[in-house]
């Protein structure tokens, strides 16, 4: 609870002192990380608790919950719990950007075990999703060694021989097709 109250104070202070309400900044997305990368904000519910508190402090839904499929998949909440939270977050007008990223590997989107398609669809169906981004990590990047050491499976080579430019382009095409298909089907 103290981490939430400290973050609320900090973000409210920045919001007020920088006069963000009167700036061109329309929203501020908050992302949670998996346990080990963060200690407190490690699932969608905890992230939303923070965002709700910050928005209450400033009086309107400026802060948004960033939905990252990889972090949702790596958290202690199952798919259904994440779906239910996405629906509630959207109803409160606090749904932010969607990160299409594969749990654990952070590699080729096809290694997501269903998390990307399911959560992206749920976000789209709320009618509140404005942006979706593709996020892929280079599995052998030395800067990511601490993450590889943190979790089994992180940094596994899921490239199938492709370079990262091609993986990213494939990911963007995949997400564009998914979004187009959801639109065609009326969502």
What kind of feature is each model-predicted range?
Residues 1-4, 31-40, 71-73, 107-108:
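Surface-exposed cleft-lining segments at the edges of enzyme active sites
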Residues 1-34:
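Glycine/proline-rich, flexible active-site/cofactor-binding loop segments
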Residues 23-25, 36-38, 58-61:
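Short, charged helix-to-loop "capping" segments that act as catalytic/coupling loops
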Residues 9-13, 17, 41-187:
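Histidine-acidic metal/acid-base catalytic patches
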């Amino acid at each position: 609870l103290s981490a939430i109250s400290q973050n609320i104070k900090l973000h409210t202070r920045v919001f007020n002192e920088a006069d963000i309400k009167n700036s061109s900044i329309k929203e501020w997305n908050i992302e949670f990380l998996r346990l080990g990368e963060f200690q407190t904000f490690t699932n969608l519910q905890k992230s939303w608790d923070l965002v709700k508190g910050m928005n209450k402090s400033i009086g309107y839904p400026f802060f948004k919950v960033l939905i990252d499929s990889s972090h949702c998949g790596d958290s202690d909440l199952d798919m259904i719990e994440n779906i239910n939270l996405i629906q509630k977050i959207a109803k409160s007008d606090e749904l932010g950007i969607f990160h299409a990223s594969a749990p654990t590997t952070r590699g080729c989107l096809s290694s997501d075990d269903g998390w990307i398609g399911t959560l992206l669809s749920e976000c789209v169906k709320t009618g509140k999703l404005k942006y979706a981004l593709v996020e892929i990590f280079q599995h052998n990047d030395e800067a990511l060694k601490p993450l590889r050491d943190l979790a089994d499976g992180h940094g596994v080579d899921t490239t199938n021989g492709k370079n990262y430019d091609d993986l990213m382009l494939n990911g963007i095409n995949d997400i564009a097709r998914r979004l187009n298909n959801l639109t065609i089907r009326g969502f």
